[in-house]
Regions:
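DPxDG-like acidic metal-binding loop motif
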Residues: 135-183, 198
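Internal helix-loop-helix
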Residues: 44-106
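N-terminal glycine-rich anion-binding loops that anchor highly charged ligand groups
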Residues: 33-49
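Glycine-rich beta->alpha junctions and the first turn(s) of the following alpha-helix
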Residues: 192-292
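Well-ordered mid-protein domain cores that form the structural environment of catalytic cofactors
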Residues: 91-128
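Generic structural signal for well-ordered, non-transmembrane alpha-helical segments
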Residues: 244-247, 286-293, 325, 329-336, ...
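C-terminal helix-coil-helix/basic helical segment that borders enzyme active sites and/or dimer interfaces
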Residues: 22, 26-29, 293-329, 340-346, ...
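Glycine-rich phosphate/cofactor-binding loops in nucleotide/flavin-utilizing enzymes
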Residues: 348-395
C-alpha cells in the first residue's frame, strides 16, 4: 500500500537498487559490511546525505520522504536500510556546524557519517579545541564512512578529570567528527542480525579536534530552515527501518506459502494442500497487513504533523514531542510482532540462513534493541501526557 509520501522519485530509485542488493547479499552477510557496488549505488541515490542542506548541494529531503526512502531500502535488506538511516541521521550534523566546517565535511558527494551520540569518550579543553580519547560503540556503516562521530564528556584534567558542568549543572557533552584514519576499528560486530551494517567499535587516542569540528548535541542548530529547527528530527529516518523489514517479512511468507506443504503448521500434510490454504496462515497474513498498515499510517501522519509545525516556524508542543518519540518505539514493536508471528507460521522457512523470513526476524530483533526505540521510551512520553517533565532531553 502506497501513501502520498512514498511517491517521490527517490523512492522509486531506491526500489531499483533491488538487483544490486540481491547480488551482494551473501557477501554482506559474510563480510559484515556493505559491498562496494551497494555503497556506490546508495551514494548515487543520495541515501547517505538526505538532510544535507541545499546550500551544500544536498537534497534536504522533507522528513516524510526520508522515512519512505529508508523504508524501501530496509525492505530490500535490513542492513542496507539501517546504514542509510544512520548516515541520513548523521547528515543533520550539517545543521550544527559553522558554514565553512559544514562545507568541508558535508560538501563532498560521497559524504557518509557513522557512529552515534552516546558520550563514551573524554574531551579535554585546549586552546582552539579539544583533545579527545575514548572507545565508541556501534559504528554502523564504518566500513564506508567518510567521518565518524565521537561523543565525549568534557573533563577537567586540572581537577582529576572531573566532569565540566554547564550553566544548569549538567555534565557538558561535546561531539566531534573524526576522519577514519584517526581511529582504530575493533572487530566487535558478531550479532543476531543486521550483519551487513559493520557496526563495529572504534577507538581514538588523544586526537586534537578544532572547535569548528565539534558541537553541543544538546544545543540548538545553527541553521534555521525547517529541517533544522527541532534537533530530535534527526531520528526521523529511523522510523522507516521497521516498516521496511516488516514489509519484507509479509512478502516472504506470501511467496513461500504456495509452495510450502501445510504440514508446516503441525498437522498431517494433505495432498495438494499448500500453506496458503490453511486458515492460520490466512489469518496471520491478514493481521500482519492490518498491523503494518496502521503503523505506517501512524508513522507518516505523526511525521507530517510535526513537519507542518516546523514549516510554520511554530513551537513543537509537549504532546507532539511525546507522540513523535512514542511513534518510533511503536513502529519497531509492531514490526517485531509481525516478524515473530510470520516466522511461527513459516516454520522451517524461518530457521535457515539465507531464508528471507529468517533474515527479517533476526534483523528486527536486533533493530529493536537500539536505545532510541526501546520500549522504555514509552515512559518519558507517558510522563509528558500526564503533565510531568519527560526526564529525557531527547523527548
Amino acid at each position: 500500500m502506497r501513501t502520498r509520501y512514498d511517491t517521490h522519485p527517490l523512492v522509486d530509485q531506491a526500489r531499483a537498487l533491488g538487483p544490486i542488493v540481491e547480488q551482494g547479499r551473501d557477501e554482506m552477510d559474510q563480510q559484515r559490511h556493505l559491498t562496494s557496488p551497494v555503497v556506490a549505488a546508495m551514494q548515487d541515490l543520495g541515501a547517505f546525505r538526505m538532510a544535507v542542506p541545499a546550500q551544500l548541494d544536498g537534497p534536504a529531503l522533507d522528513p516524510m520522504t526520508q522515512v519512505a526512502v529508508v523504508e524501501e531500502l530496509s525492505r530490500l535488506d535490513g542492513s542496507v536500510g539501517w546504514c542509510a538511516m544512520i548516515a541520513a541521521a548523521g547528515s543533520y550534523v550539517s545543521g550544527f556546524l559553522a558554514p565553512d566546517a559544514a562545507r568541508r565535511w558535508f560538501g563532498p558527494a560521497d559524504v557518509c557519517l557513522a557512529g552515534q551520540l552516546a558520550p563514551t569518550g573524554r574531551a579535554v579543553r585546549v586552546d582552539g579545541g579539544y583533545r579527545i580519547s575514548g572507545r565508541f560503540r556501534f559504528g554502523s556503516g564504518s566500513g564506508h564512512a567518510t567521518a565518524l562521530i565521537a561523543s565525549c564528556l568534557v573533563v577537567d584534567d586540572r581537577h582529576d578529570g572531573a566532569p565540566v558542568r554547564d550553566e544548569r549543572g549538567r555534565p557538558e557533552i561535546r561531539s566531534a567528527l573524526l576522519r577514519p584514519d584517526q581511529v582504530t576499528m575493533i572487530d566487535t560486530w558478531h550479532t543476531t542480525g543486521l550483519w551487513g551494517t559493520g557496526s563495529n567499535d572504534y577507538e581514538a587516542h588523544d586526537i586534537l579536534i578544532a572547535d569548528e569540528d565539534s558541537w553541543n548535541p544538546a544545543g540548538a542548530m545553527r541553521r534555521t530552515e525547517p529541517l533544522y529547527r527541532y534537533p530530535p528530527l534527526f531520528l526521523v529516518p529511523h522510523a522507516g527501518v521497521p516498516l521496511g523489514i516488516a514489509r519484507a517479512a509479509i512478502d516472504a511468507l506470501i511467496e513461500v506459502a504456495d509452495s510450502k506443504a501445510s504440514a508446516a503448521l503441525g498437522g498431517r500434510a494433505k495432498e495438494g494442500r499448500a500453506l496458503a490454504d490453511e486458515a492460520q496462515c490466512q489469518e496471520a497474513v491478514a493481521i500482519a497487513e492490518v498491523k503494518l498498515g496502521a503503523a505506517r499510517a501512524y508513522t507518516y501522519d505523526t511525521v507530517a504533523e510535526l513537519w507542518e509545525l516546523l514549516e510554520a516556524d511554530e513551537r513543537v508542543p509537549p504532546k507532539q514531542r511525546a507522540m513523535y518519540r512514542a511513534m518510533m518505539t511503536y513502529g519497531h514493536q509492531v514490526a517485531k510482532e509481525i516478524c515473530v508471528s510470520l516466522a511461527d507460521i513459516g516454520s522451517t522457512s524461518s530457521i535457515f540462513h539465507g531464508e528471507p523470513l529468517q533474515r527479517s526476524l533476526r534483523d528486527i530483533l536486533t533493530a529493536c534493541q537500539h536505545r532510541m526505540v526501546h520500549p522504555k521510551l514509552y515512559v518519558p512520553a507517558g510522563r509528558i501526557l500526564l503533565g510531568r517533565d519527560s526526564g529525557d532531553p531527547m523527548v
